Amino acid sequence: MSTREIRIATRKSALALWQAEYVKARLEQAHPGLQVSLVPMVSRGDKLLDAPLAKIGGKGLFVKELETALLDNEADIAVHSMKDVPMDFPEGLGLYCICEREDPRDAFVSNTFKSLEALPAGSVVGTSSLRRQAQLLARRPDLEIRFLRGNVNTRLAKLDAGEYDAIILAAAGLVRLGFEDRITSTISVDDSLPAGGQGAVGIECRSADSEIHALLAPLHHIDTADRVVAERALNKRLNGGCQVPIACYAVLEGDQLWLRGLVGQPSGGTLLVADARAPRASAEALGVQVAEDLLSQGAEAILKEVYGEAGHP
């Protein structure tokens, strides 16, 4: 076993650093003697905290700087939250590992109310996600959705300061950072369909670096990967970045994959839903099939409206 060093490019947020440390520990466990170090950096998405994500440029907000580090040989792998990873990669880079998925659900967090259903009319709910907003308002048009950005600690502090009656966050992020006790209730995927890849960690590296590919192989979780491939194929067919009101979630049932996709107006006025099953070997085709169903229902008009407001394709 080579003892070469692996340098991990990562964002500096607490959650990103947790993910990088997780990958570091898994690599060291799989390959005793391997030297693994972190190369923390700040992404554009981390710098622009005063505007909704959908308005500051959709795709690659949290990964571009990390990809530049790979291309410039300043790092060997980049660790990403899969829901932030664009569908297409720069020439010379690719996604070579998807780790086992954590809980993909959204979490309801409140100091006063036990669940979404318990919120009184007019309650203020914080989220930065158009996907969550569309589904929340479809169920509860009487709620006020208010913009919420920042890292997990910042968002919890804003809730504790009384700026919101409740906030919606990814359950996986709260669990990973030790805030499991702050989850008031988890929201079922039937009530809040997750973002594609939510809860999964992906590893990007140089396409030609076969030694790195071999080192990553023990971390690759094929069941998670098949599910995420279907979800990402749906996103790609809809030309979706990570900041659009698109949700998708795949489940393995034996050798069959079941995939549900959703496109919603941020106002909650219209929610389009489609689902289908296929052999897991056809994960990518399944994603395209469900996306085509959504397009046939009018998804393109909803997404064009959102992109028009955001000012980017």
Curated annotation (Swiss-Prot):
Transmembrane segments: none annotated. The porphobilinogen subunits are added to the dipyrromethane group. Its cofactor is dipyrromethane. The keyword Transferase applies. GO terms for cellular component: cytoplasm. Keywords: Porphyrin biosynthesis, Transferase. One of its GO terms (biological process) is protoporphyrinogen IX biosynthetic process. It is an enzyme of class 2 (transferase). It holds the Pfam family Porphobil_deam. The gene is hemC. Belongs to the HMBS family. It comes from the Bacteria. The modification S-(dipyrrolylmethanemethyl)cysteine is found at residue 242. This is Porphobilinogen deaminase. Its EC number is 2.5.1.61. Monomer. CDD domains: PBP2_EcHMBS_like (cd13646). The lineage of its organism: Bacteria, Pseudomonadati, Pseudomonadota, Gammaproteobacteria, Pseudomonadales. GO terms for molecular function: hydroxymethylbilane synthase activity.
